[in-house]
């Protein structure tokens, strides 16, 4: 499985998480880019390269943050890149074996942290345990005003990262405890299900 992610923090999170729920000898490689635009700019050439050598058993997963983009339009662009490269996407495949799946973290990777607050609490024991029950945090994919900023504020309020959130360090720490089966983020669940389907 080849997983393309937009930034090193996503790579760090997934390196901690994926080995705990990928079974049966399946392997994966993670390829981080320098932001969403960098990945989107390089994606057509990367997918064209894959289309020339991809073995039947390989699967590609492309993961992007939605940020403040129109998620439907972003997904359309990602799907068009797959079609233009001659790769069969999960969306287009229906019941056929697919080669590539496009997934979007809504709105940002940090929403997935809010979806698994137990993992955050294990990595950062001083954070309040009731955060998921607070108004504005109940749906991890609908946190207003910037997910990473909200996450940073909570950590800073209890003495972590006073100089600013170190995203890769936090991703690594939380990924080590993340439970793929209990995350409340719908966008995480869509990603997890695609991974499980890819390794069947």
Question: Where do the PLM segments sit?
Answer:
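N-terminal beta1-alpha1 ligand-phosphate binding loop
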Residues: 1-14
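C-terminal accessory helical subdomains adjacent to catalytic cores in phosphodiester-
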Residues: 11-37, 41-61, 66-200
């Amino acid at each position: 499985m080849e997983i393309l992610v937009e930034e090193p923090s996503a790579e760090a999170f997934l390196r901690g998480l994926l080995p705990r729920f990928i079974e049966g000898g399946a392997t994966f490689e993670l390829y981080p880019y320098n932001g969403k635009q960098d990945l989107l700019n390089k994606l057509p050439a990367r997918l064209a390269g894959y289309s020339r050598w991809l073995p039947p058993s390989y699967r590609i997963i492309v993961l992007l943050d939605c940020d403040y983009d129109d998620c439907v339009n972003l997904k359309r662009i990602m799907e068009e890149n797959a079609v233009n490269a001659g790769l069969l996407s999960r969306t287009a495949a229906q019941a056929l074996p697919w080669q590539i799946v496009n997934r979007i973290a809504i709105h940002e990777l940090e929403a997935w942290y809010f979806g698994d607050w137990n993992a955050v609490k294990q990595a950062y024991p001083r954070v309040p345990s009731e955060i998921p029950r607070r108004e504005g945090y109940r749906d991890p994919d609908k946190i207003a005003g910037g997910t990473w900023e909200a996450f940073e504020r909570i950590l800073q309020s209890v003495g972590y990262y006073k100089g600013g959130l170190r995203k890769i360090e936090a991703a690594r720490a939380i990924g080590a405890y993340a439970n793929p089966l209990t995350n409340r983020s719908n966008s995480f669940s869509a990603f997890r299900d695609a991974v499980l389907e890819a390794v069947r």
